[in-house]
UniProtKB/Swiss-Prot annotation:
Protein known as: tRNA-2-methylthio-N(6)-dimethylallyladenosine synthase
Gene behind the chain: miaB
EC number(s) reported in the record: 2.8.4.3
A GO cellular component annotation in the UniProt record: cytosol
Enzyme class: transferase
Organism ancestry: Bacteria, Pseudomonadati, Spirochaetota, Spirochaetia, Spirochaetales
Domain of life: Bacteria
Amino acid sequence: MTYFFETYGCQMNQAESSSMEQILLEKGWTNSSDAEHCDLLIINTCSVRITAENRVLGRLGHFSGLKKKRKFFVLLIGCMAERLYTEIQKEFPLIDYVVGMFERNLLPQIFDEIKARLKNDNYMAEFTHDNIEEKPVSGYYFAPLSHSPKSFQSYVPIMNGCNNFCTYCIVPYVRGREVSRPVNEILQEITELSSRGVREITLLGQNVNSYKGEDGEGRLIDFPKLLTLIAREADKTDMIRWIRFMSSHPKDMSDALIDTIAAEKRLCKLVHLPVQHGSDTILKRMNRVYTIEHYKNRIKRLKETIPDIALSTDILMGFPGETEDDVKATLDLMQEIEFDSAFMYHYNPREGTKAFNYPDRIPEEVKIERLGRVIDLQLKITAKKMKAKLGKKVDILVESHSRNERSELFGHTEQGEMTVIQGNPPESLIGNFAHAELKELKGKTFRANLN
């Protein structure tokens, strides 16, 4: 029996797909090379932007034709499955199972049922659409392991959901309120990942800074304390060398967290801190609950405490009511802070959010033009920052051979820059760390020589 994943959206979706893959492998399934020939197609969906949903709808249309030609099962999961639970199966009858965000604990049984149905056309299905919907909601299920086989990197979900309710964001409505994973479960996963040869982990949550989980003795552990505990667990084998985390909310970027990042050698000196906009007026309408002054204060504290820190952010343009002065404020902020990189996008109205009913929507062509200015500026800043790193000696996690030249190796730096090691480096470096000098920059990829 074969499976194939199509995963859309955020890193949490990728982690959840990896955790489901672990279950399938343990049950004897094998990974198919493509979606066209699998027995089970699992589509893990995203609802953050309408473009992500449209891509899924397009793929469902494609697979509708394929399903008329051969037998296979389609399982829809993720945020879109939660948001459009009933409607989407009515529109696309090819979907055999829709599993919402809070029914994921049923997946092991559903996988067994699909295997039985593949073997026997007369098998009576238990987990019909109505039955799944009527099952008691268990709350969010944290899988014990989210590691993709043979990978030197792994995501580790530590919390799910969001309590912030930014007016443009659908996430709290599809993922629910914040739930923190128990400390001991997280540390057990760290131990298992170390035994599997994982060298780098990324802690995940919609707002990791607000983590508040209990340890084995019932004590409440906040995010800085959790990071310290994870670092001490990693010390035991020295296998996991780099620890990352995302996403963070500026209101929760505490001095204690900044000091912990500075103090712990395993914590990567890279912080992703979404600002979303440079105008206080727009931030207030977004319900971001901080001001630009507060944000700049946090950035100043980060730079003063960790001089070599790299900073990335999210920027959302074209929010309802946005003026040219608001756009200028955003461009000014970018020039002042000089983010190393940014994820930039324009506003998509999401039905069910507060901003969906806001007046003064910005015309599509204006949103695109404003976003273009932001992207152009960030590209210049990123190029400047990357050129300044030429000649520096850095550590690189070597992941694989280079796609273009097998005699070269590919990896990334502590601050996430893609790097090719040239000069016939030994293949034994794959899965290990190499110390190298950044010699050239081609596009957004460094070329480096071993020291």
